[in-house]
Amino acid sequence: MSTEPIAVSITGLRKSFGDKTVLDGVDLTIRRGEFVVLLGPSGTGKTTLLRLLTGLEVPDAGEVLVPGRRTTVYQEPRLIPSKRVLANVLVGLRRTRSNRAAGLAALAEVQLDGKADQWPATLSGGEAQRAALARALVREPELLLLDEPFAALDALTRLRMQDLVGDLVARHRPAVLMVTHDVDEAVRLADRVIVLDRGRFAVDTAITAPRPRERADPDILRYQTEFLAHLGVGGSDRRPIRSAS
């Protein structure tokens, strides 16, 4: 069991919209440096859970404890067109030499050296998403929330971004909760994968396969098959693999 401090603690979380219960008694703990991926069909409450962690939604019941420094990277980079790349990375921060240096260092970490003075419109989709990552990193988050951050990218760029995010998380050690529909992506990146179904966690599984993870590895295929079954794809034999502990 990890001895890292707990970054996220959720107990008995309930959230409804009108007559529809979206989250029904959810319990979740994420430790610092732990990469947790949330899978589930559309409309099962994945994004609602992220919004509760950011404070954009308020729970109807239960307790949500999160660190003060937290930030979100979305599917769309959300760069401000009228600000240059470095200014986008530093948006909302004080204009100091130290912050400028931190912004340039963050751009270097995401391999955007030399792009600081460019306009967002000149960036490719992958570069724009890397700028969004730099904007998150410069805030030194204790909790990093990723809302389908690679969904709009082509397959090759997506793989490169997965590798980059994995490296950055290993280096900076925030707690991470990522929402995705991509089972391959989940198994490739996660320390734990959770499947959300009808407002509850149907699966909470530790991924113990060594890194780097290859799709052809039998253990990886086993995890993928299990998660796909819980998502209603493939076979219907839903035997548990291994519970997170």
UniProtKB/Swiss-Prot annotation:
It is found in: Cell membrane. InterPro entries: AAA+_ATPase, ABC_transporter-like_ATP-bd, ABC_transporter-like_CS, ABC_transporter_ATP-bind, P-loop_NTPase. ATP binds at residues 40-47. The gene is ssuB1. Part of the ABC transporter complex SsuABC involved in aliphatic sulfonates import. Responsible for energy coupling to the transport system. Its EC number is 7.6.2.14. Residues 8-223 form the ABC transporter domain. GO terms for molecular function: ATP binding; ATP hydrolysis activity. SMART domains: AAA (SM00382). GO terms for cellular component: plasma membrane. It is a peripheral membrane protein. This is Aliphatic sulfonates import ATP-binding protein SsuB 1. Keywords: ATP-binding, Cell membrane, Membrane, Nucleotide-binding, Translocase, Transport. It comes from the Bacteria. Belongs to the ABC transporter superfamily. Aliphatic sulfonates importer (TC 3.A.1.17.2) family. The keyword Membrane applies.
